[in-house]
Amino acid sequence: MCIRDSCKAAALLGAVVMMISALAGCGKNTKVVLTAGLKKNEVFRISSASCVLPEVMVYLTNMQNQYESVYGSQIWNASDGQLSLEQEEREQVLTQLARIKVMNLLAQKKEVTLDDKEKERAAAAGREYFTSLNSAEVTALNVTQDLITKMYEEYALAEKVYQTIVENVNPEVSDDEARTITVDMIRVSDSAKASQVLGKAKEEGVDFETLAQAESEDQTVTQSFGKGEVPEALEKAAFNLGKDEISDVVESDGSYYILKCISTFDEAQTKANKEKIVKQRQSEAFDTEYTAFEQTLVRQLNEELWNSVTMIHQDDVKTSSFFEVYQMYFQHQE
């Protein structure tokens, strides 16, 4: 793979992981019952929502091939000492699918549905992805076009119920709340040295950035941050500085800091921080409603079937576009 293709693949993988992560997670308080009345190919059921083995294999195989296109097939040999990376990926897929099923149940409760145009998009996406599969992939995944379309519908409905819940979150964020400050920072681990460096910093004609590069124990000198992003002592010292002012020695978590304010307000950074704060509010609002709903549900897991699930290692099973096709038909048409 050439460097350009590798970078493109890495960027796509990052987008896929971000999209999946947005819907990932499974509440720890969900009631679990093992293999109670499940059909042969059902991996799990949450209330009336069922997940069958082909759905798991579509997610698992696409994520597997995305990773392998960037990092190679040997990546699955890595381990954190407890679980192999393959086992971790299996668990992530189970979590992702459980989340989507719960969100679809929540959509039913809130009477949120896909409109005709959204269903048409799901059908078109299902048709495109299914026709991209070769015969070996269809056999290995054991999928039909109807199942793929259903999976796209459920993913789209999960995103739609999320948007329905967060649409009333207050989008107004003040400049002060979102303000980002930029400082040059010196960090040392010795109090006496910090006092010595502070004396140098306040000498007339001394270039603070050059001093920081020479004295700081951190490689990065210039940093930008908003409120709540650094320890309280550093935040208070930084936000009390005017442009070009130098702080006294600030102690935090066993280290000693000296700050020089480069900018008290960065318009671009503040705008980006406002968007970040709104997204955080939205996430918190959704999580509150989702968690309360999820705790009322019973989840049944076909443990024997789940334990038999493994990645497919076949040269003729390389499908990796399931999530890319979804993005093309939904996220690119908003």
What are these regions, as identified by a protein language model?
Residues 111-118, 207-212, 247-250:
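Surface-exposed patches in mature extracellular/periplasmic domains of secreted proteins
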Residues 36-69, 101-107, 154-165, 182-190, ...:
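FKBP-type peptidyl-prolyl cis-trans isomerase
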Residues 139-187, 214, 232-275, 318-334:
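Proteostasis/folding factors centered on peptidyl-prolyl cis-trans isomerases
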